[in-house]
Amino acid sequence: DMEDDFMCDDEEDYDLEYSEDSNSEPNVDLENQYYNSKALKEDDPKAALSSFQKVLELEGEKGEWGFKALKQMIKINFKLGNYPEMMNRYKQLLTYIRSAVTRNYSEKSINSILDYISTSKQMDLLQEFYETTLDALKDAKNDRLWFKTNTKLGKLYLEREEYGKLQKILRQLHQSCQTDDGEDDLKKGTQLLEIYALEIQMYTAQKNNKKLKALYEQSLHIKSAIPHPLIMGVIRECGGKMHLREGEFEKAHTDFFEAFKNYDESGSPRRTTCLKYLVLANMLMKSGINPFDSQEAKPYKNDPEILAMTNLVSAYQNNDITEFEKILKTNHSNIMDDPFIREHIEELLRNIRTQVLIKLIKPYTRIHIPFISKELNIDVADVESLLVQCILDNTIHGRIDQVNQLLELDHQKRGGARYTALDKWTNQLNSLNQAVVSKLA
């Protein structure tokens, strides 16, 4: 496993055979010591560490065998959870990148170490790791590695919701992709898209739709790049969230579908999440189209997480509150644990409750609020706030008598509007009739 071993060992050894002077006697000892140490790695990692230390003692001047030994020591310490020692060894390895190994080899090695350590869930450790790397790269002038490390640090700040620190990194990243006159350098399209994706995620998390909209449009106009589908997935997912929050359900639907296809292509588990969002947009736009008719989405139709969402759709379309809430309860973790879905499920629940409420109160002039509460299966306080909302937006004409816990309906007012319209219509007919009569006279 290439990632597991900080690059395939055979490839490393191949590199070394041609870069070392094979007549140099000490190299044979170093090589033997290195391979003996490596043989101990699986069964006795602690003995392997002592043995790799001997490689460092034998090498005298910094060279590739020491570099290789340090890589193995970083890996073993990471696996053993000896993080302070791992950091010490990493700092030691970074002193080799200026002269002891070739630029290309050190870049490949650090890249693979970064990818490997990035699997850790220890935020503080990762932060120290990335910052140490960036410090070492200040002198090394390695733009690609600098960009990659900064992007990883940016993602870390995004996860930790440290937006001030993230903005500082975004500024540096943007500057690295600008022309002399401060415009986006379109020759760096792929990197630009990565920066946009990071920034778009930040504004999505902050619910700053104004900034998000401008960036989102810009990102879709970068044509020079061959974007990684994962990056495009991130951008389209954020676009979908933005459109959904603005009530543009069809645009959201399109974006979530594009995001799903991109995530699917890159093998990202976010594809299932985006399918859920697609179903959500489908409900909100009251679409009759089945999102699972498409060739890409069909294989996921019976995925348990997706199934819960599709069952939700049919309960929603039938205004079946009991079933809707039952599905939410049974599948609480895979629906309501997602803050974005939770944000909109409440809107869907309000829509259903309003429909049921209107049907429920139709025959009455006065109705007890506790009775509505029982029928809708929500607290009296929630019924009152729903009624207030409906009265304010003229869905219901009436008033709440809080003392007696009653809703008094003004059917006359409701009929009154109809009566006024009829009256207006009769008057118009009258005047039309008079105009015709006077013409004929």
Curated annotation (Swiss-Prot):
Which Pfam family is an annotated match for this chain, by its short name?
PCI
**A cellular component annotation (GO) from this entry:** COP9 signalosome
Record's keyword annotation contains Lyase: no
Q: Where is this region: Disordered?
A: 1-29
User: Keywords for this entry?
Assistant: Cytoplasm, Nucleus, Signalosome
Q: Which GO terms fall under biological process for this protein?
A: protein deneddylation
Compositionally skewed regions (Acidic residues) per UniProt? 1-23
- Where is the protein found, in the record's own terms? Cytoplasm; Nucleus
Determine if Acetylation is one of this entry's keywords. Answer: no
Which ranges carry the PCI domain?
A: 252-414
Describe the family membership recorded for this protein in Swiss-Prot or TrEMBL.
Belongs to the CSN2 family.
Q: What function is annotated for this protein? A: Essential component of the COP9 signalosome complex (CSN), a complex involved in various cellular and developmental processes. The CSN complex is an essential regulator of the ubiquitin (Ubl) conjugation pathway by mediating the deneddylation of the cullin subunits of E3 ligase complexes, leading to modify the Ubl ligase activity.
UniProt subunit comment: Component of the CSN complex, probably composed of cops1, cops2, cops3, cops4, cops5, cops6, cops7, cops8 and cops9.
Q: Give the protein name, as stated in the record.
A: COP9 signalosome complex subunit 2
